[in-house]
């Protein structure tokens, strides 16, 4: 009877067996252990730090709270979220903003103005600091204008001025109120006197609304300062403000350095301005749609609400 041949291990098998003998059982489970403790991919900005308390807040919780922290801080938000939170069910039509001639002064403050515009557009996804939407707010049709502080500090320039005028004209064409959410550090220095001209032009646009008998409601958000405060932000029929919003012309530090006195606690904040009669009501973000709908419905009651 022929004896069975013992298989001769291949070269690769010999190497594997030798490695297992050297490492023992640990070598067999090591790959699984390494996989279990390997660095995992985690989404960026998973946590957001509260500017008041330093608490780390889970981003999804903050989104569910409309970007209002447990401490009550109303975080700054852009046009997309503002439209989503303001219009009924978030449904709205985005209206175009006019194009303008860019950088007429060929301005550079260490970085060309055109490069700053390009960087702001890439960061925000917006063409400029103004965005316009049309839809229903608390059941009332309205044109809503949102100023984006993330776009070069929401500064008022030619494009923003044209955007405001376009929003006013859209409201007149549709015979509906205009609601403006303001957020700005002032006029855009890179456009010089051309930016200051927008203060007068936006004021004329508001006069057009008044001549048409249409309401103009302003919601002041953090921060609203400079030339914006000195023009369309303070010309509304009704002024609402989000809690804790900084509202004024010059900032508190500039004022303190000028008058060399300490300002009262909460100076220039929305709650302080309500006490002084500069703002009609401080309204939390979650209540804004219902409050705006009630105000718009009341102001339009004499002529009946119309939808375009």
From Swiss-Prot:
Q: Which reaction does it catalyse?
A: N(6)-carboxybiotinyl-L-lysyl-[protein] + acetyl-CoA = N(6)-biotinyl-L-lysyl-[protein] + malonyl-CoA
Compartments annotated for it: namely: Cytoplasm
Broad EC category? transferase
> Boundaries of each CoA carboxyltransferase N-terminal domain copy?
46-308
Provide one Gene Ontology cellular component: acetate CoA-transferase complex
- Ranges that cross the membrane: none
Entries under InterPro entries matching the protein: AcCoA_carboxyl_beta, Acetyl_CoA_COase_Trfase_b_su, ClpP/crotonase-like_dom_sf, COA_CT_N
What's a single GO MF annotation on this record?
carboxyl- or carbamoyltransferase activity
Kinase as a keyword?
A: no
Instruction: Alphabetically list the UniProt keywords.
Output: ATP-binding, Cytoplasm, Fatty acid biosynthesis, Fatty acid metabolism, Lipid biosynthesis, Lipid metabolism, Nucleotide-binding, Transferase
Instruction: Report the record's Gene Ontology biological process terms.
Output: fatty acid biosynthetic process; malonyl-CoA biosynthetic process
Q: What is its EC number?
A: 2.1.3.15
Q: In which pathway does it act?
A: Lipid metabolism; malonyl-CoA biosynthesis; malonyl-CoA from acetyl-CoA: step 1/1
Fetch the Pfam families from UniProt: Carboxyl_trans
Please report which protein family the annotation says this sequence is part of: Belongs to the AccD/PCCB family.
Q: Whom does it interact with, and what assembly results? A: Acetyl-CoA carboxylase is a heterohexamer composed of biotin carboxyl carrier protein (AccB), biotin carboxylase (AccC) and two subunits each of ACCase subunit alpha (AccA) and ACCase subunit beta (AccD).
Q: According to its UniProt entry, what is the function of this protein?
A: Component of the acetyl coenzyme A carboxylase (ACC) complex. Biotin carboxylase (BC) catalyzes the carboxylation of biotin on its carrier protein (BCCP) and then the CO(2) group is transferred by the transcarboxylase to acetyl-CoA to form malonyl-CoA.
UniProt name for this protein: Acetyl-coenzyme A carboxylase carboxyl transferase subunit beta
Organism equals: Caulobacter sp. (strain K31)
Q: Which gene specifies this protein's sequence?
A: accD
